[in-house]
Amino acid sequence: MADTQTPNLQNTAEGDANTSAENERSLTVRANHQSQNTRSWLRYPFLVAGIALFLGPFSFFWPREGPIDSKDYVERTKRVLKTTPLIDGHNDLPWQLRIELHNRIYDGRVDLSKKLLGHTDIQRMRQGMVGGQFWSVYVDCDTQQQHFEDPSWVVRDTLEQIDVTRRFVNEHPEHLQYCDTPACAREAFKSGRISSMIGIEGGHQVGGSIGAIRQMFNLGARYITLTHNCDNAFGTSASTVAAGGADQGLFKLGYDAVKEMNRLGMMVDLSHVSHQTMRDVLGVTRAPVIFSHSGAYAVEPHLRHAPDDVLRLVKQNGGIVMAVFVNRFLNMKNPDQATIHDVVDHILHIAEVCGWECVGIGSDFSGTPFVPVGLEDVSKFPDLIQLLMERGATDQQIRLLAGENILRVWGKIEQRAKELQAGGEKPIEAEYEGRNWHKGMKNSPWMLRRSRDEALVNGAADQPFMFNVDSEGKHNPVVKQV
């Protein structure tokens, strides 16, 4: 048999008794300890209060985030631009992509996230604390078209510019976000991205067509400059007047264009237009207007700027004038001597006449070879803000200037469009006088006798008409020898 040890029942009973006693003592100790802890916690607030009273006089030694010195313009600027998006109303980078790369952005020749020549790249936008950017999809107008009958290449090129803008924005999702609403622009800023919007720089880019305006809106454009440096079907440009031409203001189709843009929620941009065109638009628009890159005529009498009477109308309208950075607009006699101080002068004058609620920033970077000293590229926006602070601008005024104004104006334009559409307003059906509707007309049946007669009057008599309507309203085939 194996040698085993039988447990001692007496020892086991005594052990159980000892264990029970120890457990009781342990419970008593824990209960007393918990009671003491409870009393300690009850006394804790009074202890903290006592310590705070004792150390209060010495608290200035502790590091903490407090009010910034009003003359610490660098820190004030950082604080403002970290919480309010700085939105630039006009940048022509897409034009550079067109001219230099023929819109080929995938072949490795350019990386927009790294520093490039010129004024604009994402690296310097980040340095400049840019929070939003309206990209201009500009296409030039090189003739004063009198009949506006050959716009096909301009409209085509505009479509290509919208395309390349959307593509380069999509290529950098960590930095850029395409937006077509002010709500999107705010959300992009909160997420750390630069909101990217599209503006069309000239009514010639829609070929004088209100239908094309609607389609550009559907493609994502959110403002149209009524004219660029040439007259178009909508109105007179500042360049025409500067060259000695008559200021005829807004043309008949221009009134319809403004009305339709109001209905759509497309911002009407009055940069580049003549002074009378500015006044005419402000007299008929049903929504706020913008000047995406202009200045104050009273500061520098260039026709690209808004006179004081127009600034007062903009105030009544609830619109915005975004200050431009182009040398020759800032100092006509000595463009090379233009500086950042000239831009500040324009901003402060606009604010004085129109109010801080209607001033913004519209640089025109990458659209001009010559910019003022101190504003050499997109990294320099904070320097402008600091100088404005030095000249007396408050943080709240800077917030309005930087981005709150354009977002508010844009929001009002959106709201007005919703009201007009909810009221049953239909899309405008209008065209410029002299429009030829019968180029390349196909052999096709006519719905109305009137249409056939109009075609004959308009010089389409050599076209075959497949059907006619007789006096009894019956459709009879008409075979015309050709």
From Swiss-Prot:
It is a single-pass membrane protein. It is found in: Membrane. The chain crosses the membrane at residues 41-61. The keyword Glycosyltransferase does not apply. One of its GO terms (molecular function) is metal ion binding. Pfam families: Peptidase_M19. SUPFAM superfamilies: Metallo-dependent hydrolases. Hydrolyzes a wide range of dipeptides. It comes from the Eukaryota. Its EC number is 3.4.13.19. It comes from Fusarium vanettenii (strain ATCC MYA-4622 / CBS 123669 / FGSC 9596 / NRRL 45880 / 77-13-4) (Fusarium solani subsp. pisi). Zn(2+) 1 binds at residues 90, 92, 201. Residues 1-21 have a biased composition (Polar residues). One of its GO terms (biological process) is proteolysis. Substrate binds at residues 228, 304, 364. Zn(2+) 2 binds at residues 201, 272, 293. Its cofactor is Zn(2+). PANTHER family: DIPEPTIDASE, MICROSOMAL DIPEPTIDASE. Keywords: Dipeptidase, Disulfide bond, Glycoprotein, Hydrolase, Membrane, Metal-binding, Metalloprotease, Protease, Transmembrane, Transmembrane helix, Zinc. This is Putative dipeptidase NECHADRAFT_87110. Glycans are attached at residue 18. It catalyses: an L-aminoacyl-L-amino acid + H2O = 2 an L-alpha-amino acid. Disulfide bonds join 141-230.
